[in-house]
């Protein structure tokens, strides 16, 4: 089993739910990214999603768009993100890291070169927002050949056919976008999430993480009751946007620890 599979197997055995925080690599300071990754892990993150900044992040709301713009302005590239993962791996060999981003930077590097470099850096999974599953079969095969899990998005509008397509090629976990629209938008309707998850789990043989609209311990716990993992991003990016530079890592760790405690309570309730 790879790191993602080991993580979810351990969570299932312990009756706990996964916590998957997202930050944008290089924001607000490229020199702080690895420190922030360690803060997430120390706070209780099970998997870290590391955003690769892109100039046209179509699925992201204004908070993450701004973070991408700041990172790009500071010279962050796919290569520098891979270097961050490699530095993180110098002292953390256990926490899975998933790169989340768009196809263009990967295609500019070349899919084969990306697979080789990502594997060497210690990347465990990759979620490419604009690779629909019906067109991503070859990409998914190349990622798996490099021991990297191809992770795909599902949404409230996903048909049973689309869910089945994802089920055929996904590994690691799937990311269920709980709201229509962009990241950081709207209010959660946990009952609608609960209604969709069984259809996903009947067709997809990997854990289901739920994201978009999760902002605090209360919403995280509610979503954890009906899913395998909770993904939180925009709230963390906002936290880093507003925190004093010298206290940002500590604030991140504290916030993640609060979510971890809430999720552990949800896991115990669910058993």
Curated annotation (Swiss-Prot):
The reaction(s) this protein catalyses: (1S,2R)-1-C-(indol-3-yl)glycerol 3-phosphate + L-serine = D-glyceraldehyde 3-phosphate + L-tryptophan + H2O
Keyword Lyase set for record: yes
Protein's pathway: Amino-acid biosynthesis; L-tryptophan biosynthesis; L-tryptophan from chorismate: step 5/5
EC number, as in UniProt: 4.2.1.20
Family membership noted in the UniProt record: Belongs to the TrpA family.
Catalytic site: 49, 60
Oligomeric form and interacting partners: Tetramer of two alpha and two beta chains.
Gene Ontology CC annotations of this record: cytosol
Key word Electron transport present: no
Superkingdom in the source lineage: Bacteria
Function in brief: The alpha subunit is responsible for the aldol cleavage of indoleglycerol phosphate to indole and glyceraldehyde 3-phosphate.
GO molecular function per UniProt: tryptophan synthase activity
Gene3D superfamilies on file: Aldolase class I
InterPro entries: Aldolase_TIM, RibuloseP-bd_barrel, Trp_synthase_alpha_AS, Trp_synthase_suA
Protein name stated in the entry: Tryptophan synthase alpha chain
Keywords: Amino-acid biosynthesis, Aromatic amino acid biosynthesis, Lyase, Tryptophan biosynthesis
